């Protein structure tokens, strides 16, 4: 990109202007986020605090897939975990605390409401042994992997002869 020195006005200090670069403009347009203004306080929802959406940590060990979510203030009776095929879903709600009309808040940034998250799992989850534990506001899902399936060798018999011998792996 070339810079041009252009003398403007009556002063003696030259001002620099940029030559138009279509590639630079294309890069700026690619980096532009049309929803950026939605996060501006002017457009914010003034009805109340944002919705409660817990963040998850998902990791894999040799034996299982481990999901962890911070759910402070959520009671275990308000959490539902379902496993359907290759999909695990976690949903629940965090209730708003009752407020007295005489109370005056200077800040109210806590979030409440219902949430639902779903994750697609790789093959091999042992759905019969899934565990869900809530301790100190942290939900831990343990989805164990099925034992590796060992291949079974099948003897190929020639046509017209009976297969009498079974070979075990």
From Swiss-Prot:
SUPFAM superfamilies xrefs: HSP20-like chaperones
PANTHER family: HEAT-SHOCK PROTEIN 20 FAMILY MEMBER (PTHR11527)
CDD domains listed in its UniProt record: ACD_sHsps-like (cd06464)
Family: Belongs to the small heat shock protein (HSP20) family.
Matching Pfam families: HSP20
Biological source species: Stigmatella aurantiaca (strain DW4/3-1)
Induction: By stress, such as heat shock and oxygen limitation.
Domain sHSP, chain residue ranges per copy: 47-159
InterPro entries named among the record's database cross-references: A-crystallin/Hsp20_dom, HSP20-like_chaperone, Small_HSP
Function: May stabilize cellular components during stress and spore formation.
GO BP: sporulation resulting in formation of a cellular spore
Record protein name field: Spore protein SP21
The keyword Ribonucleoprotein is assigned to this record: no
Keywords, ordered alphabetically: Sporulation, Stress response
Region called Disordered, residue ranges: 1-21, 150-169
Name of the gene: hspA
Keyword Transmembrane carried by entry: no
